[in-house]
Regions:
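A short, proline-enriched helix->beta-strand linker immediately N-terminal to the Walker B motif
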Residues: 156-160
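Conserved ABC ATPase signature
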Residues: 137-141, 145
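Conserved ABC ATPase "signature" region
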Residues: 114-132, 241-242
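ABC ATPase "signature
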Residues: 222-223
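A short, surface-exposed alpha-helical micro-motif characterized by mixed small hydrophobic
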Residues: 204-206
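The feature captures the beta-strand-to-loop junction immediately N-terminal to the Walker
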Residues: 47-49
Length: 247
């Protein structure tokens, strides 16, 4: 693999937090000694049980949590994150137009008000919604519509890396499929790199180019889903697959 094919590279990535228990302080290591890479243009799935460190790794890539040890090198311009809960991710007091314009106001490039509105309308079309949604507020939308708004808002600054943290787990099954298809289409059109965090290994099989398995803050397996699912090397991976009814 050529160096230019790697958009994010982690070496010995270690993250710890200090917990206070009464008068006592206790260090908890959440990620320990991770070596990994994210290839440009791929969809990399990050799987593991709750508490395995998936969300912490995503935040570390974005520089949202400090590293105790190691390094993360990122070549991604304007990386963005989509969160699990579309209900709490959007300001309920603001219109969709206001919400989606905010990233443009914060970016380096300056836009006029009419240019921002045009970009919002264009992005709404890309996520399968029309201009009629611009003056609505989040409380007027369904969960699937809200998540489409979250995706569109994340795309407003043309990110090279999109981190999706359990983006469909709060949605009904039929809506999950629609949102995943939207993300797949956006990935194809925009040649995005996506880090897809989920506990749903079934979804990852058809959606991801590679899957990385985390257990207690360590990477235990990484590879193409068809290889990992047909011949898991680690007992923990097999346990996850059995729990999902895959093996």
């Amino acid at each position: 693999m050529m160096a230019e094919d790697i958009i994010v590279k982690g070496k010995d990535v270690t993250v710890s937090f200090i917990n206070k228990i009464g008068n006592r302080k206790e260090k908890k290591t959440v990620l320990e000694g991770l070596d990994f890479d994210v290839q440009r243009g791929e969809i990399l799935g990050l799987a593991g049980e709750s508490g395995s460190g998936k969300s912490t790794l995503a935040k570390a890539i974005l520089g949202m949590v400090p590293l105790e040890r190691g390094s993360i090198e990122s070549k991604a311009e304007n990386p963005q994150m989509i969160f699990q809960d579309p209900y709490s991710s959007l300001n309920p007091a603001k219109t969709i137009s206001w919400i989606m314009q905010e990233p443009l106001k914060l970016g380096k490039k300056k836009y006029t008000g009419s240019e921002r509105l045009a970009k919002v309308e264009e992005m709404l079309g890309e996520v399968g919604l029309d201009a009629g949604y611009m003056q609505r507020k989040p409380g007027e939308l369904s969960g699937g519509q809200r998540q489409r708004i979250c995706i569109g808002t994340a795309l407003m600054q043309a990110p090279e890396l999109l981190i999706a943290d359990e983006p469909v787990s709060a949605l009904d099954v039929t809506i999950q499929a629609q949102v995943l298809e939207l993300m797949r289409e956006i990935h194809r059109k925009k040649k995005l790199t996506i880090l897809f965090i989920s506990h749903d290994l079934r979804t990852m099989y058809n959606f991801c180019d590679r899957v990385m398995i985390l257990q207690k803050g360590r990477i235990v397996e990484c590879g193409k889903p068809e290889d990992i699912y047909s011949d898991p090397k680690e007992p923990y991976t097999r346990l996850l697959l059995e729990s999902a009814g895959i093996v």
